[in-house]
Each structure stands twice: as C-alpha cells, then as structure tokens.
C-alpha cells in the first residue's frame, strides 16, 4: 500500500452526511487499491459530531472494504483521544493517524507522554502525524526515535512542508508517509515510502500510478499548487463536484465554500487530468 487517501466527508445540501456519496468515495479508493483514511482535516473531522462519526464508521464498516481503513484522532485532551480510540478500535479498522494535540503546543516531553499514553491503550497500529500548520507545533524527531521500537508505532505522516524532518523521521527506522501531494518526489528521496493524498480523492488510479513512478510531472504539480490556494478541503470538493463525483461541494462552518476563489481555473485543472494520464501512460509503454 503506497497511497492512503485522506477522504472527504461529502455532505448534502442540508449539510447532513451524504452516505451514498461516501460509499462512492471509499469504493473508488478500494478499486484503485488505495488505503482509506477517515476523519482527518480533509474529512472535516472537527465539524463532525461524535454521533456522526459513529454513524459514518458504522456505515463504512458494513462495506467490508478490502483495503486498509484508518481513522483520524483529533483531540485537545488525552481523555478525549483515549475515549475515541477505545470506542473506534472495536470496529474492523487497521489503525489511527494521531497528531500532536491541538492548540496546546506541547514540547518534547509533553509530546512523548501524549503518544506513550495513546500507544498504551490502543490495540491498533498508530501513525504519528506531523502537521504543525494545523496543530501549532511540530512533531519532535526525538519523540519518533524514542517510540520507533514500539510494536504499534506504524510510522509517521509528515506534513511539515520540508524534507528535513522527513529525513530525521526516516533515520529513526519508522516508515514515513509524505503528507503533501506536491512534495512526493522530494520526500521520496528523503526517505518517505508512501503518500497520504488529498488529490487521490478525485484521481485515485492516477495518484497510485504517480506515486509508483515517483517523478515530477508538471500537470500534477500544477493541480497541487491550485489546491493549496484555498484551505483544504474547499478545492478538492469543488474539483470532485465539477467531475460529478459528488453532488454537493458544501463544507461545514467555520469553513465556507464562498471562500473558494479559484473557480475560474477549474477548466484548466480538469484538463490536467488528461495530460497526467498521458504522461503516466507514456512511461508504461516505453
């Protein structure tokens, strides 16, 4: 498994979860052989009530996917994180993505205690998540090194925005997943061996093939740069709606689709799909 898709949570016009669209999203990943990651920032986890997460997890579990299923753990307190993990691990899931706690900005020792406590209660593999732009603090490489030998420490997702941390994480001996679609070739050279992708929501097979070939392609870079112009998941939802993959592009407060200002470039981005497909195919033919 080289690609794990950070899946959107599709909504209806009344902002309730669109379960039919959710099935379509995860089935498309299953068809491509990509892992499924629910309840991350792309999935608007913080805008989902506990009962809604329960309903979505219950629903996806009934689909009996034949690809790995991961869940996000977004919490400000250790009690909240542990409560979610203890509940969710009763379902047929394959692991959790766990960032540093939100807002509190713990240091080296605080992070170590945070992850040690989570590893002590989890019965499923844990992927530590470095995302300082979301949490306010970077994951310390020393924390990763100290936890690397734990049997349930599966690896690190690195969304730190540079290759430096990726190199240090990889030197700890854990598997590193690149958390930035646009940085995959550079991160691969720095030790990453997989991609947690947003773009694969809309192009699952192309993302899989792009990661396998591991080379810089302008059409991919252009699309990633366009997605980064707006806060995630505004761009990916707009792109999926334009391709008729979901009926509604709406996001929940405090996000608003009215903040999406890049609609005039959608036609160019949609054209990137054919260009990317042709480039990937040309390598396969050679």
Curated annotation (Swiss-Prot):
As its record notes, the protein acts as a catalyst of: L-aspartate 4-semialdehyde + pyruvate = (2S,4S)-4-hydroxy-2,3,4,5-tetrahydrodipicolinate + H2O + H(+)
The residue range of the signal peptide is none
Q: What GO molecular function annotations does the UniProt record carry, in alphabetical order?
A: 4-hydroxy-tetrahydrodipicolinate synthase activity
Alphabetical list of SUPFAM superfamilies matching this protein: Aldolase
Keywords for this protein: Amino-acid biosynthesis, Cytoplasm, Diaminopimelate biosynthesis, Lyase, Lysine biosynthesis, Schiff base
What is this enzyme's EC?
Answer: 4.3.3.7
Q: Which residues form a coiled coil?
A: none
Name its pathway: Amino-acid biosynthesis; L-lysine biosynthesis via DAP pathway; (S)-tetrahydrodipicolinate from L-aspartate: step 3/4
- S-S bridge residues: none
Site positions for Part of a proton relay during catalysis, renumbered to this chain?
41, 103
GO BP annotations of the record are: diaminopimelate biosynthetic process; lysine biosynthetic process via diaminopimelate
Functional note: Catalyzes the condensation of (S)-aspartate-beta-semialdehyde [(S)-ASA] and pyruvate to 4-hydroxy-tetrahydrodipicolinate (HTPA).
HAMAP family named in the record: DapA
UniProt protein name: 4-hydroxy-tetrahydrodipicolinate synthase
Q: Which organism was this protein described from? A: Chlamydia muridarum (strain MoPn / Nigg)
């Amino acid at each position: 498994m080289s690609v794990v898709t950070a899946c959107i949570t599709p909504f209806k016009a009344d902002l309730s979860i669109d379960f039919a669209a959710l099935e379509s999203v995860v089935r498309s990943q299953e068809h491509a052989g990509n892992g499924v990651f629910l309840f991350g920032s792309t999935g608007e986890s913080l805008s989902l009530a506990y009962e809604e997460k329960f309903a979505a997890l219950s629903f996806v579990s009934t689909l009996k996917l034949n690809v790995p299923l991961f869940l996000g753990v977004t919490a400000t307190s250790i009690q909240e994180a542990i409560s979610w993990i203890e509940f969710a691990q009763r379902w047929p899931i394959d692991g959790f993505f766990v960032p540093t706690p939100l807002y509190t900005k713990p240091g080296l020792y605080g992070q170590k205690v945070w992850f040690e406590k989570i590893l002590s209660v989890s019965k499923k593999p844990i992927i530590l998540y470095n995302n300082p732009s979301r949490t306010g603090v970077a994951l310390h490489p020393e924390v990763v090194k100290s936890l690397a030998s734990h049997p349930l420490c599966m690896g690190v997702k690195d969304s730190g925005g540079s290759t430096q941390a990726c190199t240090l994480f990889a030197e700890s001996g854990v598997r590193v997943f690149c958390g930035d679609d646009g940085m995959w070739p550079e991160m691969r050279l720095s030790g990453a061996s997989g991609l947690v992708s947003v773009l694969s929501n809309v192009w699952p097979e192309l993302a899989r093939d792009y990661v396998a070939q591991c080379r810089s392609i302008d059409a991919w870079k252009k699309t990633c740069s366009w997605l980064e112009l707006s806060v995630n998941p505004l761009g990916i939802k707009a792109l999926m709606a334009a391709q008729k993959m979901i009926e509604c592009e709406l996001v929940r407060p405090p996000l608003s689709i009215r903040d999406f200002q890049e609609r005039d470039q959608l036609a160019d981005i949609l054209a990137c799909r054919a260009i990317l497909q042709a480039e990937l195919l040309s390598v396969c033919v050679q």
